[in-house]
Amino acid sequence: MKYVKLIKTIEEIAPLELAPLWDNSGVQIYTGQEEIERVLICLDITEEVIKEAENKKTGMIITHHPLIFDSIKKIDTDQVTGRYVCRLIKAGICVYSAHLTFDNAREGNNFYMAKLLGMENLKTAAKERPGEGSKDPAELPSGMTGQLCRQMTPEEAASHIINALEIPQDGIRMVKGKNTIKKIGLCTGAGGDFLDYTIREGCELFITGDVKLHEAQRAKAEGISLIDAGHYGTEHI
């Protein structure tokens, strides 16, 4: 496929305007190819991913998490990012990151996780919360709310999530709320900022990863169940 057409196809699925200003979704490395014959898709670029891409003569790696996130002041092969960048350029491998663009996409990570859980009446928060003043609209928390097919206890919901996301039994941390669970809020990755929105929406459970102490304490005080299924656990899907 033509390189230009491939980029256009990716951005039709995960438009760049869905990313906040601080995110670094998009082209990260372009090595001059006009044609891309083989693509490798990954969650993170690691030593193992690069080795596989080299062995399979991959023209592009499409990664969820950006290889280059902050601005680069120098490329130093004594550092992981610099070493990876040099190695990829030397191998002629392009890199594209679909990070929050894919999280917020119509059928991206949040949507797919909701479908795995069998949720109905889905509502995307990103579309419901316009920017205020000069604030970038995409800076606002993104995620999704919806309903389970039936009422569940917190324990039943936890078991359902473990099975649906195919994560280990000890792969979650949980704050048990006061009520049975029907309405859920979720945000893949590190989505603690979405907790307030799920509380306002009347959710009985919030699912995300990388939950901080004060977020867990807030959930307990509000009586909402909270499940930390891990950053990887909510995105390896």
List the model feature ranges, each with a label:
Residues 1-237:
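Active-site catalytic microenvironments in core metabolic enzymes, especially phosphate/sugar-handling
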